[in-house]
A protein has these predicted regions:
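ABC transporter nucleotide-binding domains
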Residues: 1-223
Length: 224
């Protein structure tokens, strides 16, 4: 029999409405496994992940799919998650069409609105991902993730592949959108200095455990 590898153990965290919880730790500490469980890609072998009081591990396939609207993800490498043959107009509106929230005739207008939200020109609708810079692609990722108006945005090393100046502008954008839309953010990162600059609370992970929770601003709201 193979031994069970415990990637995450004894983790007890709350994500608060409109606030950012940072998860920081070195590679291999369990951050990615934790994220996969939060967004229901993996199920925990024990314990619960509660969202509005419901245990996500107990949801049916259909309920899990519907719940994806409430939790959206921004990855480190947008190119890996985009279809290179799709224009930006289709990349941005695909989630809305999949969930039956947009007519095809409304695609371009909605895509332009989403581009404006992330401070990109409207004529980007006709571009392809490879015709854009890394920072621009990450803005497209953010716009796509927020198109469904989720309650929680999960950013997995979302700025680590970007230059420092671009990193700062993307974080400024996320902070602005969080305030405007009152979104909760779970921001996974290996750079403590970066995450301290904007997170309200930071959990430090080491070998699958939360070893320290560093408070940011006072967090008094109720957990979602």
């Amino acid at each position: 029999h193979g031994r069970t590898l415990t990637a995450c153990n004894d983790i007890n965290l709350n994500v608060y409405k409109g606030k950012t919880l940072g998860i920081v730790g070195e590679s291999g500490c369990g951050k990615s496994t934790f994220v996969r469980m939060v967004i229901s890609l993996d199920k925990p072998t024990s314990g619960e992940i509660l969202y509005h009081g419901k245990n996500l591990a107990n949801l049916s396939k259909k309920e899990t799919w519907l719940n994806r609207q409430n939790m959206q993800m921004v990855f480190q490498d947008p190119l890996a998650s985009f279809d290179p043959k799709m224009k930006i107009v289709d990349i941005l509106t695909e989630p809305l069409i999949n969930f039956g929230k947009l007519r095809r005739s409304e695609k371009e207008a909605k895509a332009r609105e989403l581009l404006e939200m992330v401070e990109l020109p409207g004529d980007f609708v006709d571009r392809y991902p490879h015709n854009m810079s890394g920072g621009q692609r990450q803005r497209i990722s953010i716009a796509r993730a927020l198109s469904l108006e989720p309650e929680i945005l999960v950013c997995d090393e979302a700025t680590s592949a970007l230059d420092v100046s671009v990193q700062e502008s993307v974080i400024e954008l996320l902070v602005r959108l969080q305030k405007e839309k009152n979104i909760s953010m779970l921001f996974i990162c290996h750079d403590l200095a970066l995450i301290r600059s904007f997170a309200h609370q930071i959990a430090v992970m080491y070998l699958g455990n939360i070893v320290e929770v560093i408070p940011g601003e006072d967090v008094t709201e109720h957990a979602v």
